Amino acid sequence: MRHRLSLMACARWEADAIAEWLLYHRAIGFDHVYLYCNDDDPAALYAAVLPFLGGPAPFVTFHHFPFQGQQFHMYMDGLRRHRHETEWLMFLDIDEFLALRGGGDAHGLIDRLPPNQGCVTVNWLFFGHNFHAERPTGSVLGTYTRRAARLHATAKTLTRTACIDPDRIDRRIFFWHGWEGLLMPGAATRTVLGDDPEALPNDGVSITDDALASRMIGRAVLHHYAFRSAADLRRRWERGAGGDFHGQEMWKRVADADRVEAELAPMNEVEDRFLADVWAARMRAGAEATRLLPAPPGPNLALRRAATQSSIGPFSRGRTVAEDAAGAVNGAPTGGFQFHTAEEARPWWQVDLGAPSRVHEIRLFNGLDSPTMAARLRAFAVETSRDGTHWMIVHVAHPTDPPVGGIDGAPLCLRFPAPVPARFVRIVLRGGGVLHLDQVEVYGEAAP
């Protein structure tokens, strides 16, 4: 088979939310999505998913189904076309996100299942509108953090496709919520905890055993962002009530009766930031992974601190040693030199961090005006001192070492396994010549 674990979804008026939904479910392990567009015109949704359609192994298979609200027939078409391409298939809407609160990825729901288990059911956990009158733009996961206190009794199905025979499926059964005996003989259906879903205690709306519900939520649950604003109740009716969407007319009646906030109040009872925080952390980690340089481990203690150097020369930028040396701690790397000593034996530059500190990392940005100038920073030492008199060498560079870079993405980054106590940091050229750098950054924190 092409895929082990896939999603099938139908979407109407979801162009603004589809990208995050696809990115999220790909991130948690789904291999493919079969997406049925039910918009009158597929252009907007097609444009939104276009980045997922290309390449040798596209993440999305896109179909436009023009008959409004015919969810049953969309899914039946999908089963006939695609069920032999994937081992497992889950039916989701674009306002449903699978939350794996027990850890792992989506494959963990089907790993180690007995061969006779044909279906896993995952229950809804309704999230509210967070009291928005109109839909805000941006992330669904980051915006909606209020939810119902109780786990909903309704579930969606994750099914082994070998157990599905389309000819056995009854039109009256919404099989994406439960197969009701339509799977092949002997195929068992179980909850995420391995229980019989038909035996779950419920009042027709919610699971009534709170301890059981808590365990189910702690394993895996569907965050259902059905109403993203007060205006969404009327929006659900406006987008169409044809076919299997006929039940959406009830929300128009609620809106017309001015009962919107009362209807949505039970969905906003509890603050729950699980997916908001998980997704934000994933986005931060992804962004950090793109850095040419890792994020600094704390504040730059050298920034705009008092600095000095051994001399000034004809190419110095400042009129005094302090004025010239300050260029290397101005926080504005340029790729060129920002201080320049005279030619002399063992030229040096140093900075006073202003207070006793614990240094975790020192970064040296070389000037890159020319290869010849950059090569002058070869044989040198980095030293630290607590008092400005007694110095400890923390790094020695040799003439055979690779040249130090700078804003080209290759500065010298000295990371210390244990914090180095210091108030002063100095760079010393070990032979004769000139010393010039772009920036010196010192990361750490004040000593306790």
Where are the regions that the model predicts?
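Aromatic, loop-rich ligand-recognition surfaces of beta-strand-rich domains
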Residues: 297-301, 311-317, 326-395, 410-448
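Short, acidic, metal-binding catalytic loop of nucleotide-sugar glycosyltransferases
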Residues: 23-32
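Catalytic-site signature of metal-activated, phosphate-bearing donor transferases
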Residues: 100-294
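Short beta-strand/loop segment that forms part of the nucleotide-sugar
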Residues: 31-40, 63-65
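Acidic metal-phosphate-binding loop of nucleotide-sugar-dependent transferases
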Residues: 94-98
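N-proximal low-complexity "stem/linker" segments adjacent to membrane-targeting elements
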Residues: 1-23
